[in-house]
Amino acid sequence: MNIYRTHLCNELREEHINQEVILSGWVYRKRDHGKIIFVDLRDHYGITQLVFNEADNEIFQLISYLKLESVITIKGTVVARDSSTINTTVSTGLIEVVVNHVTIESEANLLPMNIASTQEYPEDIRFKYRFLDLRRDKVKHNIILRSKVIAELRKSMENMGFIEIQTPILTSSSPEGARDYLVPSRIHHGKFYALPQAPQLFKQILMVSGFDKYFQIAPCFRDEDARADRSPGEFYQLDMEMSFVTQEDVFNVIEPVLLNIFSKFSSKTIHKEFPRISYHNAMLYYGSDKPDLRNPLIIQDVTEIFRDSQFNIFNSNIKKGMVVRAIPAPKTANNPRSFFDNKIEFAKTLGAQGLGYITFNDDSSAKGPIAKFLDEERLNKIKSICNLQTGDSVFFVSETEDKAAEFAGEIRTILGTELNLIEPDTFRFCWVVDFPYFKYDKKEKSIGFFHNPFSMPQGGLEALNNQDPLSILAYQYDIVCNGIEISSGAIRNHKLDIMYKAFSIAGYTQEMVDKKFNSLTRAFKFGAPPHGGIAPGIDRMVMLLADATNIREVICFPLNQSGEDLLMGAPSEIDTEHLKLLSLNITKKS
């Protein structure tokens, strides 16, 4: 028999009444009723109410002074609760255990946070005492949810014939674009390993090696700043790659996997469609390459309506090559002036010059700072293209195309939120496809890759030879859910002539490519199959499923926003002898 417990703290029921039991756990709550002390004993599985009677003075005194979160083992008799104390919110709510023996396994110090409270504590306290924070129901449930999601993902991949393969953690610097975490070599002085930003090259080499379907729950390391949906340091993704597939094949594999996960672990409404939105249309109609389809507002381009109009500010901008975007605001025509002024001020905080607007009032008249500069024909065109009704308003932003998209997208988001237009308790997915292959860097005055340099350009070598590089699209794709990018992938470029040409446009010689990506180019010289893949982010998926607003809520031991591990004290200084062993010298910043 287990000396610490005969039952778990969620197991005892009416059928156990009069049985002698042994339980172990943490002292969760204490209620002193004078001659009786009630204790809620908690373990990983649940809670059982314990009863300590004054008649057993030694035990009674012991428990009366014991601090919360101390660990105890008790022996006692299961009895039925009085009808007035029955608790239907817990599985053991019909019984309690009258204690006749207690062993203190470990006594707790005074707590820096109340485990039983729903009070929000500062992150520095929570992360420093993460072992306490993880005892709280909400955090614990998030971690358990994460475990179940990963188990289900593995099951799905194995059922589809994927093989799980672990790729190296110590590798060379990768091309993903973020900063690497570097590890100095003790043996090879002056040389460094890098922690992988993603298993990109390894999984492609696995396809060249003849494996048909690969996956792993892959740790990825990027020296990036924290955001609400991005943890600094490391994250995990369901990394997968397949040989002899098209973009459609990848879509057909991953969509059922995600739908299964979201259906299994959430009670929210799940829209099973994955509409496909080109990158161009995402930026035009949603002002973001991560469109939140729960928001029904659609941005429209109204540049041509304002061209040669009497509104000189926009007309002048258009002549300089700028655009005008319209963001509808339903049923706001009668809102107070402060509503519109607040949006203008918000736009200015984003860096916009300002924000125009028109209201279409109940008397069918158009009002606002811009309305008087537009004739009836132009006003009607705006109403038509923006699908406006009487009582609606519309905001306008005029900037360069990229800034107009950004500002309009932010206005769309804040309007959707303030006007309660966001569809509640639902998940809406979409694909963003047809990303540009190249981009122009105004600062460097050069062409570079827009995203993944190893993706296949649409049109192949012919497009690279004959098209304007900035017009070429890539076989790259993202999955977005509720405005959060949860996955990114691509059909890979498996042909060396196309790869060399693509890199040459981005300023790399063949020798530079061979040196930087030697493992991949060598492998491609020995027969490379067409291949592609995708990598849904596990942290972000669990964040959505847990309805958390911050990704750190679903990571067991997260870094804080400054990239510090307050529990373990990392990063930390290294002693001089260790630095000498690695041939390193630290130069203090002045």
From Swiss-Prot:
CDD domains: AspRS_core, EcAspRS_like_N. InterPro entries: Aa-tRNA-synt_II, aa-tRNA-synth_II, aa-tRNA-synth_II/BPL/LPL, Asp-tRNA-ligase_1, Asp-tRNA-ligase_1_N, Asp/Asn-tRNA-synth_IIb, AspRS_core, GAD-like_sf. Pfam families: GAD, tRNA-synt_2, tRNA_anti-codon. It is found in: Cytoplasm. One of its GO terms (biological process) is aspartyl-tRNA aminoacylation. Residues 200-203 are annotated as: Aspartate. It catalyses: tRNA(Asx) + L-aspartate + ATP = L-aspartyl-tRNA(Asx) + AMP + diphosphate. Disulfide bonds: none annotated. One of its GO terms (molecular function) is ATP binding. GO terms for cellular component: cytoplasm. It is an enzyme of class 6 (ligase). The record marks H33 as: Important for tRNA non-discrimination. Its EC number is 6.1.1.23. NCBIfam families: aspS_bact, PRK00476.1. Belongs to the class-II aminoacyl-tRNA synthetase family. Type 1 subfamily. Aspartyl-tRNA synthetase with relaxed tRNA specificity since it is able to aspartylate not only its cognate tRNA(Asp) but also tRNA(Asn). Reaction proceeds in two steps: L-aspartate is first activated by ATP to form Asp-AMP and then transferred to the acceptor end of tRNA(Asp/Asn). Homodimer. This is Aspartate--tRNA(Asp/Asn) ligase. It comes from Ehrlichia canis (strain Jake).
